Amino acid sequence: MKKMILSAVMLVFAASGYAQETGAAGAGERNEWLPTFEAVAVDADLDVKFVRVPDTEAPKIVYDTKGSYTTKFRAEVKDKTLRISEKPDSRRPERTEVTVYYNALRAVSLSGAAATFEGTLDAAVLDVTVNRKASLTAKLDVKDLKKEQTGYSTANLSGSVRYLTLYVSTGKVAASDLEVMSAEVNAQSKAEVSLWITDRFVGKTTTNARISYKGDPKIVRGGAKFMGGEINRVE
């Protein structure tokens, strides 16, 4: 009987200890396990880091709202897409920091967020959308990449891609450290794009956009269209 009572008391202390840890985390960093997802959509002005974990580990999210209780931070997985959102508040002195631990990704969408990938983002096929002054820094190992970038956003890319389809309107794509075998690029509205292309390049610029590329592709098509623009090969 005494053993039963002692066990019950220990369980109560264990439960209250867990509640305290959860409550303490509520004012700072939170850690939540997630169901499996294949895509991420971030629509918030926050800083997010992506870390790949083995398939044997469950994905999770760690976030810190820096003590703000008005952000209404939300992260949920629906239809195999992790959706992250947060209520904007210009009075906040600090941005929310997020770390996403994932197994594999086929699509990434960023709106307003500053995103970095730890290690190499590896995928056979990858779709990336960056808009509303978002930023992306990543090292890639991708066979087929489709990327759309608008809204004065920026991207710094390295690594290797076999096939690239890129649309950029405003903003900047710095990819001179990304080795691309074949690229099709459409740059508009004063966008700036720098690339490294080895075999095939199809490029088009309009409304004062600029594309510069290094490498010696044997197949080159395209040119400047409406309201000019520039396409230049650099050493």
Positions of predicted regions on the chain:
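Intrinsically disordered, low-complexity terminal regions
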Residues: 1-235
